[in-house]
Amino acid sequence: MNNWQHSFNNARPLDEHLHKPYLQYDGIEKHLTKFIFDDHANLVWTGDTYGCVSSYDVNFQPYVRQRAHIGGSPVKDLMSHSSGVLSLSSDSLHLQDRRGTTLLNLTNIDIAAFNDLQTMCYMSADQTSKVYCAGTDIGTGLSLIDLQRGTLETNIPYFSKVNFIKSSKKLAAIGKLSGSIDLFDPGSNQVIKSFISHSSCITSMDIQDYTLVTTGQSNGFYNTFADPFVNVYDLRTMRQLPPISFSKSTSMGTVGADFVQLHPVLPTIVMIASSSGAFDFVDMANPSLRTQFANPGNGIKCIRLSSNGDHLGVLESNDMFSTWKRPNSSVNFTNMPELLTYPSYPNDGPLANISIDDYNYPLSTVGMPYYQEKLLSTWSTVIFRSPGTVPRDIDKILTDLKNSKKSKKLVADGVNFYPYSVAKYGHKDALQPYISLRDKRYQRSTGSVPDDVLITKSVDGELPPAFKNLPLVVTKYATDSFDFESVNKTPYCGLDNDVDNPFTNALIQLYRFIPEISNFLISTLKHEHFESPLLTDMAYLFDMMRNTIDGICRTTNYQMSLNDVLEKNNLSLHTISESNMLQKINSLSLNDDGGKKQLSIQELNDFLLSELCEEEVKFIDQNFVLQHCYCCEFAVKTKGCMTYGQTSGSLYKPSITIGPNACTQKNGKVSYPHSILGYIEHGLKNSIVLNKKCEQCGIKENLEEDISIQELPPILSLSLEFDDNAMKLAKTTKNWLPKEFYASIMKNKPLVRGSVNDIRTNTMIYKYELHGYIARISDPDRGDHYVTFSRIYNEESKMFRWYLFNDYLVTEVDESIVYDLGKHWLKPEVVIYGDAEELRKPFNYLKDVEIDDSILYKDYFSAAIRESIQKEYELLTRNEAPRPGSLIAIDAEFVTLKNEKYDIDCRGAKTVVQSKVSALARISVVRGNEEQFGVPFIDDYIIIEKNIDDYLTKFSGILPGDLDPKTSNKHLVPRNVAYRKIWLLMQLGCTFIGHGLQNDFKHINISVPKEQIRDTAVYFLQGKRYLSLRYLAYVLLDINVQEGNHDSIEDAYTALVLYKKYLELKSNGMMDQVLNKLYEEGRTTNYKVPLKL
């Protein structure tokens, strides 16, 4: 290996694209990270810190460049492939062909194990369709990727930080960050041998056939240093050979070895190099035969041999690239290079003679001449440096706008002049912070959250993290893998925002802490009533939230009932953010709202309270608890025509709308109230002039309606509809939102004052305290959304505390933050004041209260199909009434109403804007007692009259028509009937047995206490891999289940028998042994049940 010569005329920088003017202020390091020779074409591939992959031909002219990894992720590793090149970043794997077209792109959104990746290799030298990926995250292990399918084939547990991984035909060598090496068998996925190679770390490694070589570093007194030798291992005998020294007795002295590579053609020759620039070619059969060289210029960052062994590429520390080659060697990098494709130049033929005075001939048809020379615009920055072009002058119209003092003249000249609103948009000179897309993708895929997410105090007027619009919790394992405890350290549960209308969560959190409303709704659950779905579903939700501590609840059933009520009234909910991608998608959908009135949150507040009052009357005749709780009673007098005088009546308003009509005008100036009290007083008295027909004589004329207050409720709900001027005054006025005020009625006129001494009357005086309010938050990153401030009374400390509810984020906030309305990103829209004594009442629970459970012992039929149903269950009797600790097994099936919707930007980043919407389709419950063990007593199919995108028949066993009352022969019941049965069983203290109960309870929308759950998927869990019910039944019970479509009765019974098996193994002390055997044998079949021949 003598006579290597350095090519001085071809050294050139390969980082020119990283030094563009528009990249100089982003704060990212700009250098190349890796280079390789292509094994199938005359190309050199490089990767950089921006995630770009570039290729250069034999003349080192740019051929292809592509942004392979987004989010500023540097390229960690490159590998030549028959179809192109593979590149690896810390969280993604990319495959592209040689023309720059993406063939495969996998990120940590697709594969959660992609985190802190460092290296990759093929499964074996002969099998290049599968790739191992590994890194420094010990929790992710080794990921085996199938490139043909583009999926994760398997994830192998490996609890060490990996720095390098190389493979040969039989084995793979794993270089650990600790300095040791593991030999890995791809056939059995086991480590068969380990070596301690270097005391600190491994810096380079290569493997070929049965030879493995490594370089590394050792620990010194104060730092590490490169070892001056190369370790050699014989993989046939599984032992270490004598090491080979590097640069022994040279004029350069003894330097450490940083790079090593076996010669691709000569198996006994190894190339060893140092970062200082020295490199040797050594014959391992006779280490004394060596040739020493020194690379001129800066130090070496990366050094590689081409696949034919004729070229040696050197990437220096300043990103200059040069090559070494032997005399009379081939110019090709590989023995049989593929032909590179270039754009073809069409021959347009000779141009016709055109007169220079012919103005009718378009110049664009002449075209550009074809050239082979290099243009000045593409010269290297090393040769030709330019400070850039001079910026254009500012348009005269813009300078006039800047210097003009009168906007009226601009409007008269046809120029629209809009002053910038600092209160609405914030400071215009504020620089937008850099947002790491890599961090965002990692947080979404792993369920992690930033450390500062609970910060509520604003810094420099900016939006604090706790107020920001939270992303959808959609990870690989849905919401189960998300760390909700990190965003909620309070005893009050949050709400999942993975629903159709997430901003309705704010209303739920506002009213659930009003004792009178919450206690009444929950008390209605004692009775059986299925005709008021909105009221009962809201009651079930309040009960579930009250029993769930520091967790999360879903509002699925409540949202479905609310949508049904809105649909009946031809209404829909307004999307508050114009930039919301989901709104844009829905506007293009065939199922658009079609002219429905869209309700704002103020209108929804009034509509919801009114609907609850109406359903309360239907639920319990002559019951007006809610009406007396929050409805204001008004007397309405209508002054008719001159003939018939006036008429009178009563009006109950659940919410008082206050807005800019409370302002007064004097001397042409508009005056607004200096606190919310003036708006409240104006809202409680009103006089309206309507132009309509008189009901007595039918004459159309102006009729005056005088509305006067008669009685104030304990709870005062206020809907704020302010214009910009009124809101601006509220933000700049101190104590605009008072902590408390006093109100009274004198001569049918309201008196609202800040102090009790300001009211002089003999009538009753009410003291109101601020309970909470809903605020609209302007988030520049993710659009507007709503949060709730609630003041909650603690019975132990006898004190009130303020809490912020932002969907699933719940945190305690300081009182000063609540009353500070001066922030430009906050706008209150619904405010609740409550009677001082009312807010201190205790919350009641349903414990030790007699509940109507008759639905458990009778059939409930829908659509008169009693005679034609197929009954597969046997009803409970009073003799076998459930008691605390009664064993029951449950399984539920679901169908898909709507599939997922994504927002894919121009870079290919995919964001979930609407998760998959599922609906409960069937619930089966079987007995677990010894008398009638395994006999079902509930088998309810749920009526679904909405469009169903996918019945999931293979997994649910539901066929088209099974859920339709017109065609089904199943036992169909409404959703609230089936839900009440499960809720009653939970209230009676039954113990639920099932497989994957967390998913079942999530779709049923019920929160069962942990002490009442026996989940066989958790009992037979080792690590993170859950075993399927079918596999466990096959191995442990020796039965085949789910051979065709799933059947919920069969699945529930199998889970029950499996739980009995678990108790038997636990009592015998065989559980750990059987569990280890389950996973060891399951790896050979990928935990699948063998197919029948």
From Swiss-Prot:
- Each WD repeat, start to end: 27-66, 154-194, 197-236, 295-334
The EC number on file is 3.1.13.4
Q: Where is the USP domain?
A: 462-836
* Residue stretches spanning the membrane: none
Residues involved in a divalent metal cation binding: D891, E893, D1000, D1051
List the GO biological process terms.
Answer: mRNA processing; nuclear-transcribed mRNA poly(A) tail shortening; postreplication repair
Where on the tree of life does the source sit, at the highest rank?
A: Eukaryota
Output a single Gene Ontology CC term carried by this record: P-body
Ranges where the record places region Linker: 336-462
Q: What is the role of the protein in this entry?
A: Catalytic subunit of the poly(A)-nuclease (PAN) deadenylation complex, one of two cytoplasmic mRNA deadenylases involved in mRNA turnover. PAN specifically shortens poly(A) tails of RNA and the activity is stimulated by poly(A)-binding protein PAB1. PAN deadenylation is followed by rapid degradation of the shortened mRNA tails by the CCR4-NOT complex. Deadenylated mRNAs are then degraded by two alternative mechanisms, namely exosome-mediated 3'-5' exonucleolytic degradation, or deadenylation-dependent mRNA decaping and subsequent 5'-3' exonucleolytic degradation by XRN1.
Q: How does it assemble?
A: Forms a heterotrimer with an asymmetric homodimer of the regulatory subunit PAN3 to form the poly(A)-nuclease (PAN) deadenylation complex.
Quote the protein name from its UniProt record.
Answer: PAN2-PAN3 deadenylation complex catalytic subunit PAN2
Annotated organism of origin = Candida glabrata (strain ATCC 2001 / BCRC 20586 / JCM 3761 / NBRC 0622 / NRRL Y-65 / CBS 138)
Q: Which lineage? A: Eukaryota, Fungi, Dikarya, Ascomycota, Saccharomycotina
Q: Its encoding gene is what?
A: PAN2
